[in-house]
Amino acid sequence: MRTKSSWYEAYDICKANNGDLAGVPDEEVNNFLREYIPSGLADDYCWLGGYEKNEGYWAWDDGHPWLYSNWQDGQPNTNPANTEDCLAMITWSSPDNSQEPGLWDDIDCALEMAFICSKSK
């Protein structure tokens, strides 16, 4: 959605619309989402449905098992305040190619950014 929200607000918006924040069960879905996010939808990142349930243990908000990941090098990490507990997909390329669309980063859940909801069939 083009609306910018914290991860928690995005979660609530998706639930209110009978959906979930998008989960990524495999590379095929990750590639689809990477291609789906059009220029202008997101600034640098876009919320997905992953969150750090316990330190070092990631889960999907829809309850599906965590079977796939596509972390950027050095991620997930933690900041001094230990608030990087939510998953975002990178939507831009850095000049040095250290960041590229489709890679994942753990981000402070309070930051506001675009997000993707999904609905079960």
Regions from the language model: what does each represent?
Residues 1-121:
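Extracellular, disulfide-bonded carbohydrate-recognition/adhesion ectodomains
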